[in-house]
Amino acid sequence: MTTDTHTLNIEEILELLPHRFPFLLVDRVLDFEKGKFLRAVKNVSFNEPFFQGHFPGKPIFPGVLILEAMAQATGILAFKSVGKLEPGELYYFAAVDEARFKRPVQPGDQMILEVEFIKERRGVARFKGVAKVDGEVACEASMMCARRRES
């Protein structure tokens, strides 16, 4: 069930992504245009399980999970752009290039994920992604996801 306003709530996200707690890292899609871009949000809570060890007394959202959140946003954009996949097909995170971390993300932050579709060829799609907190870039990267059959 897709809304006409180009937003997606958590129930709609769960229909598209196979991820579940504690690894579902997109809370809401704020806006998207098929084949072009997507803006989503990840609310960073102190209750996230990894904050116990990353780092005690100075909790920082792990950089690899920022990349994973951006990858999940690219997966949602890919699903919304291509439509339903064949049974047994999934989008897999295939590559990340030029990742740069500009500022830490901490509990209480709201991370805005912005992904832009670049091109698709033979089931492999390229995207550019940016994660922002309070309008400031926290992370940026180029990413690829691939449409593949589950084995």
Curated annotation (Swiss-Prot):
One Pfam family from the record: FabA
The keyword Lipid biosynthesis appears for this protein: yes
Record carries keyword Lipid biosynthesis: yes
Reactions performed catalytically: a (3R)-hydroxyacyl-[ACP] = a (2E)-enoyl-[ACP] + H2O
InterPro entries referenced in this protein's UniProt entry, alphabetically: FabA_FabZ (IPR013114), FabZ (IPR010084), HotDog_dom_sf (IPR029069)
EC numbers for this chain: 4.2.1.59
Highest taxon of source: Bacteria
Main function: Involved in unsaturated fatty acids biosynthesis. Catalyzes the dehydration of short chain beta-hydroxyacyl-ACPs and long chain saturated and unsaturated beta-hydroxyacyl-ACPs.
Protein name: 3-hydroxyacyl-[acyl-carrier-protein] dehydratase FabZ
Lineage of origin: Bacteria, Pseudomonadati, Pseudomonadota, Gammaproteobacteria, Enterobacterales
Gene transcribed to yield this protein: fabZ
